[in-house]
Regions:
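PLD/PLD-like phosphodiesterase catalytic module centered on the HKD motif
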Residues: 1-48, 57, 62-64, 93-230
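Gly-rich Lys/Arg/Thr-decorated short loops/hinges at beta-loop-alpha junctions or inter-strand turns
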Residues: 78-89
Length: 230
């Protein structure tokens, strides 16, 4: 009745990503006022009172365009054909797993070339049990990459040399997924709706976005990991 078009996405894939784009224009100034939002948490009032999640709201036209393009793909409205030269957002089953593999490989190369100071991985997630990702992280730790995983629930990994695994137990449910690569102010920070599980990476519609460096989330999160709450 109100012109809402309800889409059910790609058949056979559960939609688990959380994102929206508002397209608007100021008629007086004739300028775009588009806004994009992407998050690790659900659009649910109940979740907001007891979950810890990460949200990003931006008017950056690059982010707005890529998030809109991704949403149209997830809605099965178009094929993801106009892949940008420098993507800042990835969708499961169309590039997210490959991007994570590349980031882990880059950390291994940095450990070999520059030492552990520039080869660090920090992961915060609900679950980690994807066999391929687990093996790659074990291999990275064996190559000298310093890895710290904060996992709330299912974890099929065990601590070992260069690999620390902890959980946070507190008043709120830790629900965000963050992947941080690098150290000393040169971190690359990614947030995602996906846990590191086969079903999320290959059988669901999930999103992962690179956080702008100016957001400062990487540095703040490193301090958070060094706290005494573990």
């Amino acid at each position: 009745r109100y012109g809402v078009d309800v889409c059910y996405g790609i058949p056979g894939f559960k939609v688990h990503g959380k994102a929206c784009v508002i397209l608007a224009r100021d008629p007086d100034l004739n300028v775009r006022l588009d806004v994009a939002h992407i998050a690790t948490g659900n659009y649910s009032e109940a979740a907001q009172s007891c979950f810890c999640d990460t949200h990003m709201v931006t008017r950056d036209p690059v982010y707005v365009h890529q998030i809109l393009n991704m949403l149209l793909t997830a809605m099965h409205k178009k094929a993801y054909l106009d892949t940008p030269k420098d993507p800042i957002i990835w969708m499961s089953h169309t590039g997210m797993r490959d991007k994570l593999d590349q980031l882990i490989q880059d950390a291994c190369r940095n450990a070999k070339l520059y030492g552990v100071k520039y080869a660090q991985i920090r992961i915060k997630c609900n679950n980690i049990c994807d066999d391929e990702i687990v093996k790659k992280l074990y291999d990275a730790a064996d190559m000298g990459v310093q890895i710290h995983i904060v996992c709330r629930s299912v974890c099929t990994m065990r601590p070992r040399k260069n690999l620390k695994i902890t959980s946070i137990v507190g008043q709120y449910l830790e629900h965000d997924r963050l992947f941080i690569f690098g150290q000393d102010g040169r971190e690359e920070v990614y947030m995602s709706s996906a846990d590191l599980m086969y079903r999320n990476l290959d059988r669901r519609i999930e999103f992962m976005v690179k956080i702008p460096n100016k957001a400062g989330l990487g540095i703040d999160y490193v301090k958070y990991l060094k706290g005494n709450i573990f």
